[in-house]
Amino acid sequence: MEFIVCNGCGCSPSKRQFFITACSHVFCETCRTTPTADFCHLCKIPTKTLKMDASLPKNVKKMFGDVGVMSTDIHKRLARVIGFQKIQKSIQLKMENKKSVMRKEQTKKVEKKTEEMHCQLSKLTSFEENNRKKLEDIERENEKLRNLISALELKVASSRDIDDDEFFMQGTPTSSNPSVAGSDVDNDELLDYDLLGLRNRSDSSSSNCSSQSNRGGSLF
């Protein structure tokens, strides 16, 4: 430890026992005890001191180690730290890449599903439009059929009225005196028409004629 000298008088450790303070100052045994043992003559403050021998703690001994050896050891430890962190970064990067690939695949699936849904929606819209047009066509046809049915009902009703009128016209006798002698119309046939009470009138006419002929043969 050629770089170590007493921070008070400048002597080397080979001549006296040395002590190190908590504030990182080194004093020989003479300077340490002047004026008191636990006092730093440079910082002018009370402090703890340790005897510089084999009983020093490891963390304090490192302060007196060989710089070359320490640098090599530090380099090795630093290399291990760098290697460890590099491996961790590589693993993290692989995981991120894997997640990125999965996200891309999921995005493609979602886009494909969205496209399929748009296609289905377009088909449904077209199907709905076609059905609407068909319903409109059916409604127009139904309207035509309703109009046709109404016209047929009116025509049938009108035809029934005409048939009834013709029936009554055909059932009425055309002769004004069906019971007169010499008529070409058969009295039996005329008597069958009782629509207007002709039977009673025929019986009455026959009775009158008989009565007149009986009177014609008698003076009284």
Swiss-Prot record:
Entry comment describing in which tissues the protein is expressed: Expressed in the germline.
Entries under PANTHER family matching the protein: RING FINGER PROTEIN NARYA-RELATED
Pfam families listed in its UniProt record: zf-RING_5 (PF14634)
Start and end residues, zinc fingers (RING-type): 6-44
CC terms in the record's Gene Ontology section: chromosome; synaptonemal complex
Primary location group: nucleus
Name of the featured protein: Zip homologous protein 1
Keyword Transmembrane annotated: no
Coiled-coil regions listed in the entry: 124-155
Compositional bias per record (Polar residues), positions renumbered to this chain: 171-180
Annotated organism of origin: Caenorhabditis elegans
Signal peptide: none
Disulfide bridge map: none
Assembly with partners or alone: Interacts with zhp-2; the interaction is required for their chromosome association and stability.
Ranges for region Disordered: 166-186, 201-220
